[in-house]
Structures are given as C-alpha cells and as structure tokens.
C-alpha cells in the first residue's frame, strides 16, 4: 500500500482515470466447497497474472460524457439508457447501461486519445485485483459478513453511489465488488475453469454471453464475493451494469 498516498484525488478531472498497478503473481481463482459459491466458480485453480494496471474507480458519467462528445470517435454509440434519469445522472456516479460494445468503444477511444492501450480486464485479472493479494477470502475486504460494512443496510437504495467514496481494498480499488456489475473482456463459459490455462487466461474463443464481475445496487445482496461470476449478452443495456478500464503496462 505504499503507493496509495501518491494516488491522484478521486475522481479524475482529465481523460485518464486514477490508475492502480496490480502486481504480477500467482493466485487461487474460484471458490471451493466450503464457500457459498456456484458450480461455475469451480474448481479452484492456480492462475498466473502478468502485472497490469486497473482504474481505481468505475467509469463515471463525467468521463463517459467526454467520449460521447468526441463525435468522430463514437459513431453509433448513443447515450446509454437512463442517461437523463436523475437517479443515474450525477457526474460522479458510474455510467450505467452501456453495452459491452459501448464499453469496448470507450476503451478504444481512450487508447487513441492517450496513445496507451486501454481495454476491459479479463475475469482472471478482475478477480486477482478484487482479492487484493490475499488468498481465498470471500470479499474484497476479507471474510467479515456484509453487515459489517458501515451503513450497509441503508446504502444503494435506488441507484449506485458516487465513485471513490467507499473504502479501498488492499490494492487501492474503490467499489470493487459493489455499485454496478463490471463488464469483462471474456466470453462466458460455465465450465471454463476445467480447461482454463494457468497463465493469463483470456476466456473461451467464442460464446453468446460476456462475462461480468462485481455486485449491483439493484440486487438484494449488494456486494459480490470475489469469486462470484455473472454474464449477459453483450448487446444488453442494464441499469446496474457499468465498467472499469484496465491498461497495459508501458513497455
């Protein structure tokens, strides 16, 4: 955590978000029989992830508005559903209801603007980041129950919270596992863990649903376990879906 004090203020006012470096290393991905997990989270398997960078916060309305304003770069990418709904329109709230294609287009626009490679994280990268360097813990903060979170019962009533206001996990990530589901790069396969490679898994080569991670303001259980998986078709636009950008390390 030695770099946390040097992190920029949240949220960023420029086109690039505050970024956290996720170190390379092995970790145990998935949930074992002792956890309240789903079959698609098993078996637990060892995975190596190369170092990469991940945005400290989910992409905000303010950041997404800059993408929409860049007319030459967003042909066919209209304002997301709920863009003008006052429940979801604060500049510091995460943008909601972009499709997976919209999220990818945003990454491509930001890459062209900054000459750096922005993209969506893989499922494996997301889970490593959410765990914060600790093995087999249930939640981004550890194994303490959800009710241990401050004001848990009164939060996320009708919409996601503004980013950067909750506690950071051990890597310095805000709302990792909460607020909105986050699109991942991978196609989803419930049985993928049985054939996943050990190093930098990218997901199956094709599919019908795209993977997502993290919890949702709209669900009864507001924060997801680190190992929990979810997916929807890539064209869907839901009010509890958003995304967080990853960035390749400069070579």
Regions found by a protein language model. Give the residues of each.
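Short, structured beta-strand segments at or near domain termini in extracellular proteins/domains
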Residues: 239-251
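Long amphipathic alpha-helical scaffold segments
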Residues: 1-7
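Functional-site microenvironments in short loops/helix caps that host divalent-cation chemistry
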Residues: 22, 28-36, 80-230, 234-239
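Short beta-strand-initiation
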Residues: 15, 42, 168-169, 240
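Generic alpha-helical structural signal
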Residues: 7-9, 199
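A short glycine-rich, aromatic-capped structural motif
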Residues: 10-80, 97-101, 177-178, 185, ...
């Amino acid at each position: 955590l030695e770099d946390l004090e040097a992190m920029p203020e949240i949220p960023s006012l420029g086109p690039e978000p505050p970024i956290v470096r996720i170190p390379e290393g092995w970790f145990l991905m998935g949930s074992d029989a002792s956890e309240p997990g789903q079959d698609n989270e098993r078996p637990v398997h060892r995975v190596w992830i190369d170092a990469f960078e991940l945005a400290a916060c989910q992409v905000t309305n303010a950041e997404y508005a800059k993408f929409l304003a860049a007319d030459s770069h967003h042909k066919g990418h209209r304002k997301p559903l709920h863009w003008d709904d006052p429940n979801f329109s604060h500049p510091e709230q995460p943008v909601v209801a972009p499709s997976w294609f919209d999220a990818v287009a945003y990454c491509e626009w930001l890459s062209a603007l900054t000459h750096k490679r922005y993209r969506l994280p893989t499922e494996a990268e997301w889970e490593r980041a959410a765990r914060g360097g600790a093995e087999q813990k249930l939640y981004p903060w550890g194994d303490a129950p959800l009710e241990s979170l401050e004001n848990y019962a009164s939060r996320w009533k009708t919409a996601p919270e503004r980013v950067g206001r909750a506690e950071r996990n051990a890597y310095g990530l805000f709302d990792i596992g909460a607020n909105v589901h986050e699109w991942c790069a991978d196609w989803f396969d419930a049985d993928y863990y049985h054939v996943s490679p050990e190093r930098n898994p990218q997901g199956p080569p094709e599919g019908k649903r795209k993977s997502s991670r993290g919890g949702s303001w709209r669900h009864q259980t507001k924060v997801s376990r680190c190992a929990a998986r979810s997916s929807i078709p890539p064209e869907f636009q839901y009010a509890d879906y958003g995304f967080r950008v990853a960035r390749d390390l400069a070579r």
